[in-house]
Amino acid sequence: MTQIIDGKALAQKMQSQLAKKVEDLKQEFGIVPGLVVILVGDNPASQVYVRNKERSAIAAGFKSETIRLSESICQEELIKIIHRYNKDESIHGILVQLPLPTHINEKRIILEIDPHKDVDGFHPMNTGHLWSGRPIMVPCTPAGIMEMLSEYQIDLEGKHAVIIGRSNIVGKPMAQLLLDKNATVTLTHSRTRNLSKISSEADVLIVAIGQGHFVTEEYVKEGAVVIDVGMNRDDNGKLIGDVAFEEVSRKASYITPVPGGVGPMTITMLLEQTYQSALRRVSS
């Protein structure tokens, strides 16, 4: 029987535990973890994500600040704002919501964030730590997936893990985290030949390709663990994943739903990394 990996329930559990840790930090050291989210423009999806992050941060006892900027802001002005929060000792996490308007260079903006406050884990210094096997700040979605696999006691050692999607946000860091757990990893993408054949050999299949219901049952072997990272809208505006849930769930041993799977855990790991950043500040 297929087991649903309930990311929403796990996120609630972890955020409840996090709220207690935040209160303990406040009582013992007088420090409240501070998170600032910088939103440029009025992308509707980004606005929803930012609201959810802000709500979760406040509920867990964080200091939460959202900076909403005009889409027309120039790159240098945005960098000045980032530098201000780099120096602000009450802020332990800085997140610039992506995507940014086309006139702003995302790579340059990521470089300007203090890597010790880069709770998205995108700064090259944090990428280097991850690839050298000494992760500090890890991209939140892969980190959340690893927590889910651990919670459901899914053993990765010696397993064949296939990732569909090679982004710097999910696919590439996910590959390294799985390698660190001694999985054998195949990283694929939209131009991979014989993709359905490769994915159907996976013990663990992680799908982050950004196409609604891309993965159907022929992509999945019997008993596989299927993690769906996708968030898409169908023709009726319904939120769907990259995996055709109904048909794939008939073959999978474990599967994440959309919504209620990976999404809530991404926010949870953002908060966890902000807390850890505050804790490192105390230690130093």
From Swiss-Prot:
The keyword Amino-acid biosynthesis applies. GO terms for cellular component: cytosol. Pfam families: THF_DHG_CYH (PF00763), THF_DHG_CYH_C (PF02882). Keywords: Amino-acid biosynthesis, Histidine biosynthesis, Hydrolase, Methionine biosynthesis, Multifunctional enzyme, NADP, One-carbon metabolism, Oxidoreductase, Purine biosynthesis. GO terms for molecular function: methenyltetrahydrofolate cyclohydrolase activity; methylenetetrahydrofolate dehydrogenase (NADP+) activity. Its EC number is 1.5.1.5, 3.5.4.9. It comes from the Bacteria. GO terms for biological process: L-histidine biosynthetic process; methionine biosynthetic process; purine nucleotide biosynthetic process; tetrahydrofolate interconversion. It catalyses: (6R)-5,10-methylene-5,6,7,8-tetrahydrofolate + NADP(+) = (6R)-5,10-methenyltetrahydrofolate + NADPH; (6R)-5,10-methenyltetrahydrofolate + H2O = (6R)-10-formyltetrahydrofolate + H(+). Pathway: One-carbon metabolism; tetrahydrofolate interconversion. NADP(+) binds at G165, R166, S167, S190. InterPro entries: Aminoacid_DH-like_N_sf (IPR046346), NAD(P)-bd_dom_sf (IPR036291), THF_DH/CycHdrlase (IPR000672), THF_DH/CycHdrlase_cat_dom (IPR020630), THF_DH/CycHdrlase_CS (IPR020867), THF_DH/CycHdrlase_NAD-bd_dom (IPR020631). Belongs to the tetrahydrofolate dehydrogenase/cyclohydrolase family. Catalyzes the oxidation of 5,10-methylenetetrahydrofolate to 5,10-methenyltetrahydrofolate and then the hydrolysis of 5,10-methenyltetrahydrofolate to 10-formyltetrahydrofolate. Homodimer. This is Bifunctional protein FolD. The lineage of its organism: Bacteria, Bacillati, Bacillota, Bacilli, Lactobacillales.
